């Protein structure tokens, strides 16, 4: 299926993005990522060793693959922190495709601070970054982020790592209608069916981390996510039948034997 996902100047064949946290080791991270078919893995900048060549480095495990790294600003709580983090990262690596995260509540929900996110987005866009912005499932905020220069909107389905699945299907659909840039459902995915539902709602892609890394069999779950995203995308493009309150016969009544 030739169905390219375009994010700014970047093109991806897979509509599944994966995370790198919570795995037992880097080798499992690599094997699960390859099983998922994903071409993009997000990594917290503060967790990646880019200065000490003598320490184990996740980046080294993917040198022989086509998987690209998507640096994120997890751990940043202000626009200024995120901006500084990404500028230093680009200077060290040359990577300009980023996942912008500015957290507002670090204790319970890990919900984003959308005001600080918008501020950071405006400045980073002027700096030439291609921005994928993590945000709430508010369609108004999604539009504001698009106006601020976001190349993709990443609304949460539920709190990060909760596995609750999509808590507000209507808002995800509203966001899809509100913006023209890709919508990538991020956070809260718990199983393959969650990913498929997100795609059926019109999301352009899904990001999954905990659902894969914390599964009993991460590699098998990664493969399940791969096919769930494909199935959901195909179903969305095919167009579902309308919901009706009553039955509609699937077989014609013409030619029935008359008693």
Curated annotation (Swiss-Prot):
GO molecular function: thiazole synthase activity
EC class: transferase
The protein's annotated pathway: Cofactor biosynthesis; thiamine diphosphate biosynthesis
Functional description taken from the UniProt entry: Catalyzes the rearrangement of 1-deoxy-D-xylulose 5-phosphate (DXP) to produce the thiazole phosphate moiety of thiamine. Sulfur is provided by the thiocarboxylate moiety of the carrier protein ThiS. In vitro, sulfur can be provided by H(2)S.
Descriptive protein name: Thiazole synthase
BP terms from Gene Ontology: thiamine diphosphate biosynthetic process
PANTHER family: THIAZOLE SYNTHASE
Primary location group: cytoplasm
Record-level GO cellular component terms: cytoplasm
Annotated residues for binding of 1-deoxy-D-xylulose 5-phosphate: 161, 187-188, 209-219
Positions of transmembrane segments: none
Recorded superkingdom: Bacteria
Subunit structure: Homotetramer. Forms heterodimers with either ThiH or ThiS.
Record keywords, A-Z: Cytoplasm, Schiff base, Thiamine biosynthesis, Transferase
Protein's cellular compartments: Cytoplasm
Origin species: Aliarcobacter butzleri (strain RM4018)
Family named by the database record: Belongs to the ThiG family.
Taxonomic path: Bacteria, Pseudomonadati, Campylobacterota, Epsilonproteobacteria, Campylobacterales
InterPro entries: Aldolase_TIM (IPR013785), Thiazole_synthase_ThiG (IPR033983), ThiG (IPR008867)
Catalytic reaction list: [ThiS sulfur-carrier protein]-C-terminal-Gly-aminoethanethioate + 2-iminoacetate + 1-deoxy-D-xylulose 5-phosphate = [ThiS sulfur-carrier protein]-C-terminal Gly-Gly + 2-[(2R,5Z)-2-carboxy-4-methylthiazol-5(2H)-ylidene]ethyl phosphate + 2 H2O + H(+)
Active site, UniProt feature: 99 (schiff-base intermediate with dxp)
Listed EC numbers: 2.8.1.10
Gene3D superfamilies noted in UniProt: Aldolase class I
